[in-house]
A protein has these predicted regions:
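Helix-to-loop junction immediately C-terminal to a conserved catalytic motif
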Residues: 63
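ABC-type ATPase nucleotide-binding domains, specifically the catalytic core motifs of the NBD
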Residues: 27, 83, 108-127, 135-140, ...
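Conserved catalytic motifs of ABC-family nucleotide-binding domains
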Residues: 167
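Conserved ABC ATPase signature
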Residues: 146-150, 154
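ABC ATPase C-loop
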Residues: 163-164
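Conserved ABC transporter NBD signature motif
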Residues: 71-79, 91, 124-129, 231
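The feature captures the beta-strand-to-loop junction immediately N-terminal to the Walker
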Residues: 48-50
């Protein structure tokens, strides 16, 4: 997929995404505490942690669905503090949510086309639809089928394809392998790696830590809403704490 061209690229060596000391609440309940990390252009970065650690909330904060109460999120050096979620998509940030959140009564093609709702994405919708269907041949076979009748793996493909219709620079995936058979998980991770090779920067939340660390450049471990560890994937895979707590070794 082509990357958005509406904003200047970050300077060489500069982060594409900066999450800077964000505090996020649900009502009076604080979920993230001064959380900070960055993603550089061209990377796959994975967020690791147990259920309830704050990984999904982090993605929602970046996408604008759960704005931080304090701290800041910057994309290409620009603060997103006053940028609504819809505008963030146009800037190049796309989220594939946990649970896929498709429109089950609409066809596969209609679900995909709904991902191209921004002005720039609408202009390239036909071209991007062809690319998505080439990336996911199963969707091409089922383009007229209702999304609600798809298998779990096919629904994940459809949700990912819908996000790609917006031509994201940063693609965020929340638990893409959740509930899928191992062979389908391998297919999903293969597609993520292929997107990365095509130039898409990826921020991945994934329950299958072995698979995530195998394709990611770096990882950030979140515990109770705070960054616990971060570093290259190889170093995290070899870390005794990570191996014991998350890999069962």
């Amino acid at each position: 997929m082509t990357a958005p061209t509406t904003d200047a690229a970050p300077a060489a060596g500069a982060p594409l995404l900066q999450v800077d000391a964000i505090d996020v609440f649900y009502g009076d309940v604080q979920v993230l505490y001064g959380l900070s990390f960055e993603v550089r252009e061209g990377e796959i970065v994975t967020l690791l942690g147990s259920n309830g650690a704050g990984k999904t909330t982090t993605l929602r904060a970046i996408s604008g669905l759960r704005p931080p109460r304090s701290g800041d999120v910057r994309f290409r050096g620009r603060s997103l503090r006053d940028v609504p979620a819809s505008r963030r998509v146009e800037l190049g940030i796309a989220l594939v949510p946990e649970g896929r959140e498709l429109w089950p009564q609409l066809s596969v093609r209609e679900n995909l086309e709904l991902g191209a709702y921004g002005a720039r994405a609408r202009a390239g919708a036909a071209r991007n639809l062809e690319r998505v269907l080439a990336l996911f041949p199963r969707l091409a076979e089922r383009r007229r089928q209702l999304a609600g009748s798809l298998s779990g793996g096919e629904q994940q493909m459809c949700a990912s394809g819908r996000a790609l219709m917006s031509e994201p620079t940063l693609l965020m995936l929340d638990e893409p392998s959740l509930g899928l058979a191992p062979v389908v998980v391998e297919q999903v991770m293969s597609v993520v790696a292929e997107l990365h090779r095509g130039g898409t920067t990826v921020l991945l939340v994934e329950q299958n830590l072995r698979q995530a660390l195998a394709i990611a450049d770096r990882g950030t471990v979140i515990e109770t809403g705070r960054v616990r560890l971060e570093g290259p994937s190889a170093a995290l895979s070899a870390n005794p704490e990570i191996r014991a707590a998350y890999l069962g070794l």
